[in-house]
Amino acid sequence: MRKYVIERDIPKVGTFEREQLRDAAKTSNAALVKLGADIQWVESFVADSKTFCVYLAKDEAVIRRHAEISGFPASKITEVKRMIDPTTAAS
C-alpha cells in the first residue's frame, strides 16, 4: 500500500473537545470497516481549522471513497514518495 497525507478543512476542529474528537474517530473507523483491507488510518494531526491525516491505501480512489462515507472532506490528497528523519543526515 502507498502512504498518503490528507488535508481536511474542518472549521474550528482545533477547538473540539475530547468527546467530539472521539466521535470523529469512531465515524472514520466505521468507514474503514466498510472499505476493508484497502485502507488503513495511521494517525492525524489536528490544527486550528484542518487536520492532516496519514493513511496507507491502495490508491487515491479509496481515500476519496472514505471521505464520502465518513462525511469528512479530503481537501487535498498527497502521496508520500519518501520519508526522511534526522538519521538521514548520517547515511
Question: For each predicted feature, which ranges?
Answer:
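Short S/T/G/P-rich N-terminal loop/turn motif that feeds into the first structured element of a domain
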Residues: 1-33, 40, 82-91
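A broadly tuned preference for mixed-charge, low-complexity surface segments
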Residues: 2-8, 52-61
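An amphipathic, aromatic/His-enriched active-site/gating alpha helix that lines ligand/cofactor pockets
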Residues: 56-83
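Residues within well-formed alpha-helices
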Residues: 24-27, 52, 66
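A short linear hydrophobic-aromatic micro-motif
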Residues: 37-43, 76
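Short amphipathic alpha-helical patches
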Residues: 29, 51-55, 59, 75, ...
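Amphipathic, hydrophobic secondary-structure cores in small proteins
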Residues: 41-54, 61-63
